[in-house]
Amino acid sequence: MTPSTIQTASPFRLASAGEISEVQGILRTAGLLGPEKRIAYLGVLDPARGAGSEAEDRRFRVFIHDVSGARPQEVTVSVTNGTVISAVELDTAATGELPVLEEEFEVVEQLLATDERWLKALAARNLDVSKVRVAPLSAGVFEYAEERGRRILRGLAFVQDFPEDSAWAHPVDGLVAYVDVVSKEVTRVIDTGVFPVPAEHGNYTDPELTGPLRTTQKPISITQPEGPSFTVTGGNHIEWEKWSLDVGFDVREGVVLHNIAFRDGDRLRPIINRASIAEMVVPYGDPSPIRSWQNYFDTGEYLVGQYANSLELGCDCLGDITYLSPVISDAFGNPREIRNGICMHEEDWGILAKHSDLWSGINYTRRNRRMVISFFTTIGNYDYGFYWYLYLDGTIEFEAKATGVVFTSAFPEGGSDNISQLAPGLGAPFHQHIFSARLDMAIDGFTNRVEEEDVVRQTMGPGNERGNAFSRKRTVLTRESEAVREADARTGRTWIISNPESKNRLNEPVGYKLHAHNQPTLLADPGSSIARRAAFATKDLWVTRYADDERYPTGDFVNQHSGGAGLPSYIAQDRDIDGQDIVVWHTFGLTHFPRVEDWPIMPVDTVGFKLRPEGFFDRSPVLDVPANPSQSGSHCHG
C-alpha cells in the first residue's frame, strides 16, 4: 500500500482541506454563510481552456441553500485572490432546486412521526410507529401546481423490527407522503388501501439465511514484490505503461479523469481532456399512484461523490493498492476527508496476444494487464462501483457495478406486469439504471470530429456472385442536430472520434472508436415527465461543441427541474462539430427486472463502454511488451 501526499503544483490537483477551509472563510467574510445557510455543492472549477499553471486562479463553485426559505445562491470563489467573484440568486421555480441535503432525510421522518394522517394510516395497518422508517426520496415534477417553487421530498415507509433488521424486506405499501422540507409541512398523505406487510426477513448475514458458510475457498494472494508499475506524483498524477493522467474527484460526479494521454515514442499524445460520469438516473416502471413518481437522479440530486465509501484492503480492493483520500465539504463548509475513497491498482488481465505459427515455428504469448481506478458509493438502497480501466493496447474502458438491495414493494395477489416477486408477498418494481458519460475529447488536440460506422451487407449479384461480401458505411456528423444518435446492434454501430488534421503513416486520420453495450435507452413514454427531465437517456449518443458552462447532461440544477435543461438546450444551438473542439456524451445503462436471486442482497451486475484505438497508432502498440517468466522458470513463448 503506497501513501499519497497531496501537493500544490498542478491546477488539476485534488482539493485540499486547507482550500475548503479558505472557501468557508471567504464566504463567511462576504456574509454568504451563516446559521441558516447550507452548502449543497462545493467543487473545484476546471482551469480555462489553454490556461497555464503559472497564471492559475484557483476557483471553487458553491451552491448555498437557505433553510429559512430565502433564495439559494450560486457562488464562485477565488481562493488565489481570497475573493467572491460572483454570487447569483436563483429562482428555483425556474432553475430547479439545489441537491438534496442529508439533514433533510431526518426532517421527513420527524415530521411524519407527528402527522395525524400518517399516524392514522399506520394505525390502520397495526404498525408500531417506533419501528417505521421512511425513505426520503427526490420528488420529480408532476401535476401538483402547489409544489412549484417549493422544496419537496416524498416518503415511503418500511418496517424495521430491530436495529440490525433490513427494513427493505418489510415495505408498507399503499402509502406515501409528500413533505415540504423548508416550511416543515406535510403537504399530502396518499393512502390507497392496506397491503399486508411482508413478514419474512431479508437479513443477509443471518445464519438462518446463509446456512453454514463455505469452507471450500482457498486463499488467493496477489503480490507485487517490487511494487506496482505505476507512479503517483503531485498527489494525483499517474504514469503507468505509457499512460499519463490526473485523477480528480468531484462531490457530484465522483472520480474525474483529466489529461488522459499515451506516450507514443517521444510524443505524449492527448486522447481525452476530461472524462466523467456526469449523470445517473434510476427511473422506475410501476404505474401505481404510490410509486409512479419514482425517478432518482443519483448524480444531480444526491451527489454520488458525497456518499463515496472508505475502501478496505482485501475487501473492496485486492492486491498492491494505492489509495487517494479526497476531501469534500460538509453542509457547513467544513472539510471532510473520505479516507481511501479512491482505489488504484494494476491487475493481470489474461492473454494480450498469442499465436503459434506453423510455418515459422514461432510460438508467441504475451500477458495483458490493466490499470484500475475506482470508487464505490452508496445511494440509499443501491451501491454502485465506478471503475475506469486503462489497457496496454491503448484501450480505455468504463464499467459500472450495481449491487446493494433492490427497492421493494408489496407483491399484489393477482400478480403484476410491472413488479417482480422476490419472496412471499414481497415485490420489486422494474426499473433502469441509466448513466451519461461526458467525454471531453482531445484526439491529438482539440480538432476532432465524429463518424458513425455501420456494417453493410452487400447484395448478391455482379461483383458479389457468391453473396459473401459485406462492407461498412461511415457518416460524418457535421452539426449538433445530426449528432443525436441511437445504437444499433443489428448493424454493429460504433462511433469514431478522429482528428482530421493528424494522420497515421497510412495517411488516415487518427482516432478512437466508441463501442456501446447496446442496452435499451429510457423506456418511459416520450410524453412522460421523466422523458423531459432525463432527455439524455432517450438517445445513446450526443455530440456538442465544447463550452465552459455545459457541464452536465441534465443541466446544473436537476432537483425538481421540469426539463429542457442540459443537452436539449445545448444542441438547440446547432453548432458545427466537424473538425471542432467537441464533447461526446454517451448514454448506457441496465434494464432491471429483479430476480429472486437478487434478494436479499444483489450480486453485482455490470454495464459500460469501451474506447479502442482506431488508426491512432501506426501499428500494434504492444510489440514492446516483454514475455512473462513461466512457472517453470523460463520465459513464455516469444
Curated annotation (Swiss-Prot):
Give an example GO biological process: amine metabolic process
| Residue ranges of the propeptide | 1-2
Cofactor(s) required, per the database record: Cu cation; L-topaquinone
Spell out the reaction equation it catalyses.
a primary methyl amine + O2 + H2O = an aldehyde + H2O2 + NH4(+); 2-phenylethylamine + O2 + H2O = 2-phenylacetaldehyde + H2O2 + NH4(+)
Q: What is its EC number?
A: 1.4.3.21
Q: Name one GO molecular function term.
A: primary methylamine oxidase activity
What UniProt keywords apply to this chain's record, in alphabetical order?
Copper, Disulfide bond, Metal-binding, Oxidoreductase, TPQ
The record's remark on the cofactor is:
Binds 1 copper ion per subunit. Contains 1 topaquinone per subunit.
PANTHER family documented for this protein: COPPER AMINE OXIDASE (PTHR10638), COPPER AMINE OXIDASE 1-RELATED (PTHR10638:SF86)
The protein's role, per its UniProt record = Catalyzes the oxidative deamination of phenylethylamine to phenylacetaldehyde with the concomitant production of hydrogen peroxide and ammonia.
Its family remark reads: Belongs to the copper/topaquinone oxidase family.
The entry's protein name is Phenylethylamine oxidase
Identify the species of origin.
Answer: Arthrobacter globiformis
What is the taxonomic lineage of the source species? Bacteria, Bacillati, Actinomycetota, Actinomycetes, Micrococcales
